[in-house]
């Protein structure tokens, strides 16, 4: 029959996000793949140049919808680095708590995402429902379930109240009690082993060549985590481990996400204990924040997102708007760069497994 061109996405139910992959297949095996971006392109980096420094706080969470807090922190850290703004200690701890809650929510959602491609719909329902409990915390803390606009230059927008602290601890205890159920349903399921073990395998050399980070890299045996390698906030003051595996397949990536939830719970509980009383924001300007100007300079910051290394390179000319902001998205290497490398040789039904376990975020790639 020869090669057949198959248009996979953007509306395919197995596609994770609004982008497309043109695949050339023989039988049910992919022989060549070409990514086709652009369906979500909004020009985030250019839009930032047209908005005041503080106005960008409403824009940046939309760069990666499932993980808005990562962009908020990168933006704030870059501004603070150029402007030499000191952030209160309590605000630093609160930022850590928010980031780790977001990490837990994302990993739970990834259990939901992998459920569809392998037919494990119970996992999909559980992951979505339990993630919703984290969103309840965000709603009470920030007023929004998704686009929080909570982490701002100088600190955070609101303090943690005793009621929210209690809510966080109760939610973490609940999720921790649910993890054995996820382990039994997913990690100890013979059918899941058949669908994920040895499937969507990535070796260490290819991962490093593509610039893969996060769970995708750690699953190949490289325990690289910026929270340990180049600590920011107060990650060097808490005790946690970086889980890794040498198998490199889809099951290894799912397993690591499961293990990372335990570590994030551990970090949040330590942060709540160590967090001092005090203010949560340093005023960045006299009067209206819209008049804030960042001094002339440049900075690069990087942090560990759920998807891997996330970075911002920011340049200020001393004006009321950023001169240039470049976003180093974590999922770009493992999707649009990686698709051409790792999809050839894959069976068609395993393509959604690749995309799901490699944590695709389409708006971030199309920024």
Curated annotation (Swiss-Prot):
Keyword Translocase tagged: yes
The protein's Enzyme Commission number: 7.1.1.-
Source domain of life: Bacteria
Keyword field: Cell inner membrane, Cell membrane, Membrane, NAD, Quinone, Translocase, Transport, Ubiquinone
Membrane topology summary: Peripheral membrane protein
Role summary: NDH-1 shuttles electrons from NADH, via FMN and iron-sulfur (Fe-S) centers, to quinones in the respiratory chain. The immediate electron acceptor for the enzyme in this species is believed to be ubiquinone. Couples the redox reaction to proton translocation (for every two electrons transferred, four hydrogen ions are translocated across the cytoplasmic membrane), and thus conserves the redox energy in a proton gradient.
Name the UniProt record assigns to this protein: NADH-quinone oxidoreductase subunit D
């Amino acid at each position: 029959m020869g090669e057949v061109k198959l248009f996979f996405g953007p509306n395919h139910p197995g596609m994770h996000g609004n982008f497309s992959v043109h695949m050339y297949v023989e039988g049910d095996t992919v022989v060549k793949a070409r990514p086709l971006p652009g369906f979500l392109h909004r020009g985030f980096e250019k839009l930032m140049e047209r908005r005041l420094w503080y106005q960008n706080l409403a824009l940046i969470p939309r760069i990666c919808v499932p993980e808005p807090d990562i962009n908020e922190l990168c933006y704030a850290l870059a501004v603070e680095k150029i402007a030499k703004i000191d952030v209160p200690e309590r605000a630093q701890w609160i930022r850590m708590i928010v980031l780790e809650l977001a990490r837990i929510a994302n990993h739970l959602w990834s259990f939901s995402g992998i459920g569809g491609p392998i037919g494990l719909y119970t996992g999909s329902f559980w992951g979505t429902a339990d993630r919703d409990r984290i969103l309840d915390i965000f709603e009470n803390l920030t007023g929004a379930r998704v686009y929080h606009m909570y982490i701002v230059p100088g600190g955070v927008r609101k303090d943690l109240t005793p009621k929210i602290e209690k809510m966080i601890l109760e939610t973490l205890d609940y999720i921790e009690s649910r993890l054995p159920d996820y382990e039994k349903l997913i990690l100890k399921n013979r059918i899941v082993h058949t669908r994920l073990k040895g499937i969507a395998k990535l070796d260490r050399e290819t991962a490093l060549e593509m610039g893969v980070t996060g769970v995708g890299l750690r699953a190949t045996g490289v325990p690289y985590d910026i929270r340990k390698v180049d600590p920011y906030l107060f990650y060097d003051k808490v005790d946690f481990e970086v889980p890794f595996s040498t198998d490199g397949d889809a099951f290894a990536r799912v397993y690591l996400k499961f293990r990372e939830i335990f570590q994030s719970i551990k970090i949040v509980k330590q942060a709540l204990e160590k967090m001092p009383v005090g203010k949560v924001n340093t005023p960045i300007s006299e009067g209206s924040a819209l008049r804030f100007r960042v001094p002339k300079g440049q900075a690069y910051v990087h942090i560990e997102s759920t998807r891997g290394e996330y970075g911002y390179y920011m340049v200020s000319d001393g004006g009321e708007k950023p001169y240039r902001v470049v976003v180093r998205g974590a999922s770009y290497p493992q999707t649009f760069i990686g698709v051409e490398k790792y999809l050839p040789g894959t069976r068609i039904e395993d393509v959604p497994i690749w995309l799901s376990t490699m944590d695709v975020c389409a708006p971030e790639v199309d920024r």
